[in-house]
Amino acid sequence: MPLSGDVKQKIMSDYATVDRDTGSPEVQVAMLTRRISDLTEHLKVHKHDHHSRRGLLLLVGRRRRLLNYLAKTDINRYRALIERLGLRR
């Protein structure tokens, strides 16, 4: 389930570090978090959709790798991001 352009623009404007920022770890993690929450809601209704469940696990793994990278490079940005997104670590 791809995100609509409006949702992407809102996430980018909220989490961007500079203008027109699409590739910073904060923006990427925020987008992945939104997709993960959408897929989680989908799987609550469609419990036997195993293809989407695998996609969810891949997204969670990608987000975990990005968060690990951010924690290694700048721990303060990492802590601010997980606090802002409400993630637990």
From Swiss-Prot:
Q: Which Pfam families match?
A: Ribosomal_S15 (PF00312)
Question: Could you provide one GO biological process annotation from this protein's UniProt record?
Answer: translation
Listed under GO cellular component are: cytosolic small ribosomal subunit
| Keywords of the record | Ribonucleoprotein, Ribosomal protein, RNA-binding, rRNA-binding
Q: What InterPro entries would the database entry show?
A: Ribosomal_uS15 (IPR000589), Ribosomal_uS15_bac-type (IPR005290), uS15_NS1_RNA-bd_sf (IPR009068)
Question: What GO MF annotations does this protein's record show?
Answer: rRNA binding; structural constituent of ribosome
Please explain the role this protein plays, according to its UniProt record.
Answer: One of the primary rRNA binding proteins, it binds directly to 16S rRNA where it helps nucleate assembly of the platform of the 30S subunit by binding and bridging several RNA helices of the 16S rRNA.
Stated family: Belongs to the universal ribosomal protein uS15 family.
Subunit structure comment from the entry: Part of the 30S ribosomal subunit. Forms a bridge to the 50S subunit in the 70S ribosome, contacting the 23S rRNA.
Per its record, how is this protein called by name? Small ribosomal subunit protein uS15
Q: Which gene encodes it?
A: rpsO
